[in-house]
Amino acid sequence: MNEQYSAMRSNVSMLGTLLGDTIKEALGENILDKVETIRKLSKSSRAGNEKHRQELLTTLQNLSNDELLPVARAFSQFLNLTNTAEQYHTISPHGEAASNPAQLSSAFKRLKESKDLSERDIRDAVESLSIELVLTAHPTEITRRTLIHKLVEVNTCLKQLDHNDLADYERNQVMRRLRQLIAQSWHTDEIRKIRPTPVDEAKWGFAVVENSLWEGVPAFLRELDEQLEQAFGYRLPVDAVPVRFTSWMGGDRDGNPNVTAEVTRHVLLLSRWKAADLFLRDIQVLVSELSMSECTPELLELAGGSEVQEPYRAIMKSLRSQLSCTLSYLEARLTGEERLPPKDLLITNEQLWEPLHACYQSLKTCGMGIIADGSLLDTLRRVRCFGVPLVRIDVRQESTRHTDALAEITRYLGLGDYESWSESDKQAFLIRELSSKRPLLPRYWEPSADTKEVLDTCRVIAKAPQGSIAAYVISMARTPSDVLAVQLLLKEAGCPFALPVAPLFETLDDLNNADDVMTQLLSIDWYRGFIQGKQMVMIGYSDSAKDAGVMAASWAQYRAQDALIKTCEKAGIALTLFHGRGGSIGRGGAPAHAALLSQPPGSLKGGLRVTEQGEMIRFKYGLPDVTISSLALYTGAILEANLLPPPEPKQEWHEVMDELSRVSCDMYRGYVRENPDFVPYFRAATPELELGKLPLGSRPAKRRPNGGVESLRAIPWIFAWTQNRLMLPAWLGAGAGLQKVVDDGKQEQLEEMCRNWPFFSTRIGMLEMVFAKADLWLAEYYDQRLVEEKLWPLGKQLRDQLAADINIVLAISNDDHLMADLPWIAESIALRNVYTDPLNVLQAELLHRSRQQKQPDADLELALMVTIAGVAAGMRNTG
């Protein structure tokens, strides 16, 4: 690991030097000297030199308005380069060794060594493996796409420089290219000027597929095949592709009025168009590769009979023309042209799969397996993973929108006001209508705009090719009628297939009631018949943590999952738990392996379905090599969790967690909800108000424009606290709960839980990571610069609580310093802190100056946005 780190540090240093050269050329020696001085002071300040810390503050406070932007940009760009070097040096964003086949082989080794498992058990588990990653356009991806492309190329250059046999002139060429890329980045605006539309976000998602996943998924499956063959002498069946991708971009309308039925329809077409484009490129390659003439009689017939000289090519050429026709038809539809579909329009995956698979079988039969297992196998696997839709779409909408639509319908029909009915009356009405053969909607009725939008969305789903919509997610689901309402609206729209409808339980109360709601639903005969033994439930991480604090929320999530697993098992229902976690700790983010192994036993039987958000998509899937690593991690963790599940926690551990949860929730809510100074303090001490100006995602930052903390979305809430380094949502309440349990004489029990219960040890590990990124002196500096004096005592109270929390966590984990068991994460945070600290100080300074201004100052605002983007890069998991 040390060797790896010294290699990374030398690359970071080289990239820093090149950035320095660029700055010097662009702005002259003076600015570069200033940046260098600040960097050295920051390094010394980090090492504990108080005099240099004061000097650092003075230097940054004394920068003129003209100097603020270049200095902020220098540190922000340096952090992007550091992250790129770190990603290259096989240390992935969470300190998990990336791109390392050993991950899979060590997982297989552990499985083989287990006395209770037969090879058949392992094989069955591999073949039923299901990983569905749901890409969401969260506004935490701060880096512009144009800069991401340049950073990917920087990564490629680092790879080339690692070759020992490079000739001098080749090394010089690579260095010249690096200089060009760094100069291009420096002269590019890093801040978007215009907020992206939902269609822009969807295109960003397709770019991730095209630039990384298209190569990365088949490469991962080849890796998996090799490891399986080495361990068990067996390869995956051709049609077994354990990885799928779904997207919320263009489908998630919860609180986002910009995502309309028309946008969803457009994104579905765009997705099919991109898939046809990518498959056409694959087929072009196969046309040139598959020049063989020997084939089976079945294939010859498929190719057109005995006259055909090159049967494989003939089939590929026919596919090529089918894809070309599909592409031009979809292009016409996207530009609004009404055109009759061609007779061989590609609509289903089978249309692609059958001819390709026939070629594969023929090559295998004729002794050309080595050819079959090349590009052709990769394409077959892409058909199974991406298929004709490329990525499937989830539609998400808030439960009250469905209630309002049905209330409008029942009022119009003279049946009363659905919204005011009791839950049992709602259920009786919904089941009656679901069982009825006549339509509910009157023919010539004109609904209100909001209701029309809900109904139009259901019609888009009904008309979409089967397989292009993955699920309908209901946010803020609280009752069985919330689920039945969506089923009825889909029936009324003429939906010809049973779409999975997933209630999302996301506040503390909703999580605690989740099992009751699902038990009631599963007791309804109509519902049981309709779902045919399968149910998806989504667990919300971010809103529950914002509602109750991270410790109470994570325990409620665990208990809800555990209860749902047991209820569905008893009812004979296959449950898929869908995890809505973010990149940050306050939104459920954790190193993948630890997070999966810390879930209740049996939670991954129905496969893994999890959201991948914002900047985490780039860190985990931005490069094919890193994609291989991330998928290998998930695969190993799921197989272990299913085949070697963690033991059921002891009853007394449950009791400790109940107490911990109660104390931590009370403390968290005592500050966030009940302290009248809290919201004014939050608004002053963080850039929360300024964050609204960042053109990040297409979603508004608030559910209600004039509400308090509760109306803030979870992402800006966490993003704001990450910026001022107090990281409050990720720890507040947790330490107080732990302290109470220790005071009750149960420290030994906590230590035992830490050693023997993955759920608990992961919670403690996540707290340590947050504490390593939090910073008391910086949080205090924000208070001094930005908060009125009467609120200072609250800031001091919170910082004292943070210091106490750090001590109690160290006592329970028996360590002298944080992250003792994960030195590479500690190293990585330390490396970035030197560059993040000046950005934090600058940000506080800029907030101070911009809040003094009578008129907005465009230059100050731009510099502020750069510091926000830079701190986000330094903290890595922003929201």
From Swiss-Prot:
Transmembrane segments: none annotated. One of its GO terms (cellular component) is cytosol. Keywords: Carbon dioxide fixation, Lyase, Magnesium. One of its GO terms (molecular function) is phosphoenolpyruvate carboxylase activity. It comes from the Bacteria. Its EC number is 4.1.1.31. One of its GO terms (biological process) is carbon fixation. Its cofactor is Mg(2+). It catalyses: oxaloacetate + phosphate = phosphoenolpyruvate + hydrogencarbonate. PROSITE patterns: PEPCASE_1, PEPCASE_2. InterPro entries: PEP_COase, PEP_COase_bac/pln-type, PEP_COase_Lys_AS, PEPCASE_His_AS, Pyrv/PenolPyrv_kinase-like_dom. The active site is at H138, K546. Belongs to the PEPCase type 1 family. NCBIfam families: PRK00009.1. Forms oxaloacetate, a four-carbon dicarboxylic acid source for the tricarboxylic acid cycle. HAMAP family: PEPcase_type1. This is Phosphoenolpyruvate carboxylase. It comes from Pectobacterium atrosepticum (strain SCRI 1043 / ATCC BAA-672) (Erwinia carotovora subsp. atroseptica). The lineage of its organism: Bacteria, Pseudomonadati, Pseudomonadota, Gammaproteobacteria, Enterobacterales.
